[in-house]
């Protein structure tokens, strides 16, 4: 397809070689860790000549990144792309995501080390309607370990299963999901898998206790991407009257938030701001339509509501990681 590299053209290798060199060589390389993931996944297997080219491409870039002292990582695809062209397996780390693409038993037999990342358990695709919006952390905590690769179950602590991970795929741009929304999906998954990587099947703390305790753990020292203020819901800022240029002293207030204010509207020019933070701007009159709206992550989101001059209203805006709602005089507008 148009989004695939043409494996039959020498120019493809020239381009990808140069790309990896740009990231791997020189005095200040981008990739400084021990491993480099070369990708290689989801090519059609309808034509055997394509399969053989795919296998040759995979083998080439395994050896290419090894030439920079890196361990190569690949996506599991070699059951789907079954062929005669040899692909190096020694000291290669394979992401085992779907057993139909890479049979984990066969891959282990061939000598690959595996990272367990079965898509049916560990794929997040935010607000897409397929895979998970949020991982089922309770099921993962109670039932899953890296030894469970899809429906295949291996002995715990198998020497060729090096661990597990989850994935977030942002398949749909412009669907309202922000980087903050993704963070709220990622962090509980990260906390849960961290425990599972450490304890395996030997979790002794009940899930309810773990789930409660994890909420009190900060993201990292000095880090608060979620914008939490304390651990309990409470009012964090009250003011009788707002004046232009006033600052709250708060960087941000994370989900689940409620902002309420009374307003007597005037005719506003398009682009008139009401609130601003490092992450978003809320408009009384957005730059495009003159309606209430907000911009974040480069996207303008507009409510189908516009104040008329001299209108008085009580306005409430609520937000969580799935939606932002507008209430006028206590009634949900959008």
Give, region by region, the residue ranges found by the protein language model.
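Active-site neighborhood of glycoside hydrolase catalytic domains
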Residues: 2-91, 97-110
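Short strand-turn-strand beta-turns centered on an Asx-Gly dipeptide
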Residues: 297, 327-331
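Flexible, acidic glycine-rich loops studded with aromatic residues
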Residues: 84-92, 98-239
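Short tryptophan-centered beta-strand motifs in secreted/extracellular beta-sheet-rich domains
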Residues: 259-261, 310-319, 324-328
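Short, aromatic/His-centered strand-loop micro-motif at the edge of beta-sheets
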Residues: 292-314
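Extracellular glycan-recognition modules
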Residues: 234-295, 323
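Flexible glycan-contacting loops in extracellular carbohydrate-active proteins
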Residues: 334
